Amino acid sequence: MRMRPPLIDVLGIGFGPANIALAAALEEGASPLQAVFLEARPSAQWQPGMLFPGSDIQNHPLRDLVTPRNPRSRYSFTNFLFEQGRLFEHLNLGLPYPMRLEYAQYVSWVASHFEAQVRYGCRVDSLRAVEDRANGPHYEVRCGNGNAYRARGVVVAPGRTPYLPPPLDGLDTAQVVHLTDYLPALARLRLQAGRLNHPPRIAVVGGSQSAVEILLHLADAWPQAEVVGISRRFGYRLKDTSPFTGEVYFPGFVDLFYGASRERKDQLRRDLHPTNYASADADVLDRLYQRLYMDRLQGVERLQVWRCADLMGARLEGGRVVLDVRRNDLGEAVLGSAFDLVVCATGFRDIGPSEHQERCPRLLHGVLPLLALDAEGCLQIGADYGLRLQPGHCGGPLVLNGLCESSHGMGDAGSFSLLALRAKTIAESLHRALPKAAAACVAPSAVTLAPYPPAAALPTGAAEAVSL
């Protein structure tokens, strides 16, 4: 008879920044909970397809995996630099944001401290709920390598699903990729370049920071290639870096946003969109504009920008991706423009009912009958990031770590900004939900969070008017 796997307290699916931060929070809180993490990749990696020169992160370096939760943590970015012998050199760079490559090394460094808790090369195929009178309700996870795990609580953190806009999402080809696969796709095209009877031609779709960084990287790394940036807007837009809008990354704003009505949430997301989406930092915008100007001075057009452009169609033809594009600024359509590679820097899917969202991540399909849904068929998420269950269902905690922008605001939009504090909230919630294992644990909070907005910022008697 086949032995059942042992029942553990917490199983984390995915070991990227979100669950790495959770592992650190559990350890530093002296948690008695037994936690195991499953990661599909052979090692801890953060966005390996985007680690090229000239790219950086877009949050303050102190908003790392731990510092907002515990400024004294040994897992901070500052301590990483110190232990690598690069602290003073890094400070001397004068960079507003760290290089993406160095921050990826930092993420891997923190992950290396939890090797004993991680099962690498374990891609999760299924997650299901189990009713067990002897052990109580729990979850069973099966991986593609044949391994199975049982846990009383599960924290799902696979990263957000890449979004490819129509009509590109319907093409089954390795020549259309999301930005997360940019470098591998570029390497494949380089290997094939000698067999092409034309200069390599690459399109970069989208108006994000990553889109601009990829355009600049291609211009530097492959001068022979023809590169076209395709954006719906008149021009690449400057990111909103106002300190006032930056308060969306204050911890108290999460509570404010979570408690807002659906209509108010939609309004806030529209207002705050330029803080994180379809916009770029001034330094890369200036570099791109200067590069385009230099090309005009030299009489070359190997780097182009198609502005006010709508994708009308896409197809495979003659081994290339052929795009039909409407140039609204010129009042004309560009039909049949062929590319050897199309990179979509078009963001990720959030939880929601619209075309660019998803109602439920694929990993949760096996437990969907247990989950409470809203009127539009989307997951209902608690303030502690736990998924709400259908009435009458009894189960352990099932938590979303990093997929809750629609319910919790911009701090959950794939940014590091509130990642450490989210891990703190989840760790505390797991202790409450799994009381037997956590009975002996009294973990003091490293940071006391103030209400938002600060009372001092409000006129006398106005505190009641802040609720949304």
What positions do the PLM features span?
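Flavin (FAD/FMN) cofactor-binding and adjacent substrate-gating region
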Residues: D56-E89, V254-R264
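N-terminal beta-loop-helix "entrance" segment that forms/cooperates
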Residues: W46-G54
